[in-house]
Amino acid sequence: MQITDVRIRKISSEGKMKAIVSVTFDNEFVVHDIKVIEGQNGLFIAMPSRKTPTGEFKDIAHPIVMDSREKIQNEILSAYAKAIEEQDVEE
């Protein structure tokens, strides 16, 4: 499965959540609401999730294989860095 599009839908300079992203696979399947989060060890992605009645968050969709997660994260963080760079140029 190939990542065919990464769309940075919202960028925030405040707080730990830096962006909300949509990723399209093979021009056929899209996953919305992936978050770019700033953690203690740098940026990472959080897959879309929902809160359970017990207050725990569960992923709605997520990669099963670690290599897939790394590939998705690398593509998203690369697109995020490019969007930030373009935003700085426009300002």
UniProtKB/Swiss-Prot annotation:
Any one GO biological process: sporulation resulting in formation of a cellular spore
SUPFAM superfamilies the UniProt entry points to: SpoVG-like
Membrane-crossing residue ranges in chain numbering: none
Alphabetical UniProt keywords: Cell cycle, Cell division, Septation
Function: Could be involved in septation.
HAMAP family named in the record: SpoVG
Protein name: Putative septation protein SpoVG
Organism whose genome encodes this protein: Clostridium botulinum (strain Alaska E43 / Type E3)
Upper taxonomic lineage: Bacteria, Bacillati, Bacillota, Clostridia, Eubacteriales
